[in-house]
């Protein structure tokens, strides 16, 4: 029951995060279009209904493949690769991925500020009158 609740509650945030990562992939190895294409094509391949969206967007955005067959402890997991035509990841892709995440956070903050400005502005004006 807890896992289903998690799936429901994270349905929109996972897709929003994937979209933000895709937008933030400008200038990264794969770019925005590849991030969106990979996200839409490969995210549903993930065993989780939500985890694949940001992971696939990052794979496309960086131009690398992620996921695929792997081993967890003694258990072998057989899974499709995200962005299967992408190159192998290199050490520099960790820093590039972190930059993409940072840009995604800035985009989200800007969107929240813009969306919230009509509500914030009157408070800011009153604050300025009180302390200005």
Regions found by a protein language model. Give the residues of each.
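Hydrophobic alpha-helical transmembrane segments
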Residues: 1-132
């Amino acid at each position: 029951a807890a896992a289903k609740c998690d799936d429901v509650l994270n349905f929109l945030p996972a897709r929003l995060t994937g979209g933000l990562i895709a937008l933030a992939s400008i200038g990264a190895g794969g770019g925005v279009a590849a991030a969106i294409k990979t996200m839409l094509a490969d995210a549903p391949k993930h065993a989780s209904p939500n985890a694949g969206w940001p992971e696939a967007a990052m794979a496309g955005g960086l131009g690398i493949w992620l996921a695929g067959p792997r081993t967890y402890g003694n258990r072998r997991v057989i899974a499709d690769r995200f962005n299967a035509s992408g190159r192998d990841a290199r050490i520099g892709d960790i820093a590039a991925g972190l930059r993409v995440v940072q840009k995604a956070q800035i985009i989200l903050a800007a969107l929240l500020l813009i969306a919230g400005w009509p509500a914030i502005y009157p408070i800011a004006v009153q604050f300025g009158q009180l302390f200005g």
